[in-house]
Amino acid sequence: PLLVCPTRLLREKKCPLFKRRSFMHELEAYLNYTAGEPVQELYAYLRDETDYPMALIWKNMIRTMHPHDFTRSLALTRIIEPTVLDAVTAESICKNRRIALAMHLYFMDMLDQSKAFAAKFPPETDVFISTSSAEKKPQIEAAFADLNLHSVTVTAVENQGRDVAAFLCDLAPQLKDYDYACFMHDKKAIQTKPGSVGASFGYVCNENVCKNAAHVLNVLCEFEKDPYLGILCPPYPTHGLYFMNMCSGGWGPNFENTKKLMKDLGIDAPVSGEKSPIAPYGSVFWFRPKALAPLFDHGWQHSDFPPEPLPQDGTISHAIERIYPFVAQSAGYYPAVVMSKSYAVTHNDTMQAYASGMIRPLARVFDCTTFYGAENSATGFAYKKHHLFSHYGPYSDSKRRHARNWLRDNLPAGSYKVIINTKRAIFGPHEGPYED
């Protein structure tokens, strides 16, 4: 009950405590018995109806928990409206905060699109642009000359490491004193076939990071109102072959090189190969420069990056793409996903279509037309998943959990601890040190 209906226990039954684990529990476990609302209700109750110091929760979550868990349980994804919601705060930000847009522009045939992206930013924005050759610099300066922006600085940089190297080596040092910043680059993803797949990847990035001018102001307000928010990333692409690759974790061949990079940089944050990093796939994202200071201060050089032709995956650039959220977490901030309101509808319909397509074949094998049949189907699926593949599925925990609870309730504390420690020594924990 402390996990499934904590708010009722606190408000109606006067329970004097709640479980820290509520915020780090996997969302799938809540979905066995609820619609996923318990943690959101608990947080709202503690914030609005008690004097509990919410900073304790935030600091503990950011220090000890994987954001894949607490951002989903607390529904921290930002859905951005296409009209300004808080004009007073937006005006105050533009007057009193320093805003920057960093861009790496390589494809001159996409210059109009890049200009349109920058045109959505408020007039107080400083724009820093890197490009790959001195010949492109005057073209970019001419294109951006008529935009209503505070300043535009264009620099030709070494063409090694593409947008990631340009961002860390040449642009980031200029962003350290800004309050809020956005990074974008002209993205084609030309390695994907057909070309529409790569173009749609770029659409996902730009649509959710900078849909229109009101979207930009609303995003700035999100940072202003949440002092723990460090990064806002667009959702990972789910179309074409991206669906299987990203929904299976998003790591690809990059888990070990990301862990190595974290060690080299001294980044200490919870990381797991079983949990997707909330990372800016495509390297288009919003951030608070303070949150990425541990990465910016490394002193990057273009020689740290492989020369062309750049491998499609598994490079230091791909590790950096995934390390951003962990850098922010080590600095005391958390990452979250940002979506435009219109794309959130598309994303929801897309995932429902995928889910229906995957469940329908199971329904042909198991009787899912009644609750009884659905329960048997879920139990059978979990049994196969656990016993054939040695993996605990979201529906496979009932008997194990009931046995654990019975032992805990009926044995002396010392005996229970010996049994659990013996089990962990032989079989290992299910996932992490808190799981029995």
For each predicted feature, which ranges?
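C-terminal functional modules of predominantly eukaryotic multidomain proteins
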Residues: 386, 421, 428-429
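Short Gly/Pro-enriched loop/turn and capping motifs at secondary-structure junctions
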Residues: 291-292, 424-426
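Gram-negative host-targeted secretion-system effectors, predominantly Type III and Type IV
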Residues: 395, 399, 406-407
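Structured beta-strand segments within beta-sheet-rich domains
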Residues: 425-435
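ER/Golgi luminal nucleotide-sugar-dependent glycosyltransferases, focusing on the catalytic module
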Residues: 1-371, 376-384, 389-392, 396, ...
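Short HxH-centered metal-ligating active-site micro-motif
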Residues: 406-410, 416-425
